[in-house]
């Protein structure tokens, strides 16, 4: 892995890895961390380019985020974990489970969608417009480049 992921860890026991949505970070799960830390080893990641985790040079894709999760688990000697993902975090968890089913004890998913074909046009259109605007200004603004990259997930 070309970066070190930032994370919060609380509690002990069976690993429960929390994966946030696009544009969020591990603080999204502050209430879940507090709730589950008495029963689990709760690990809330900041995925690549989110929160305190650096962007790095690898592709900014769900597939890469799943690779990062694998590397994170390998480095910390986590053989198997419960994965809880929200939105793009659910997408990361699903991708990871497809590629490494032996590493997943259970999946808890909310709002995941690996195939956006089922998303209502009224929901998708503002994202597409925002992406196009950000791409237009990406050459002149680092913030616009970052927004375009996130909206492109």
Task: Tell me what each language-model feature is.
Residues 118-122, 136-153:
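Conserved alpha/beta-hydrolase catalytic His-Asp/Glu region
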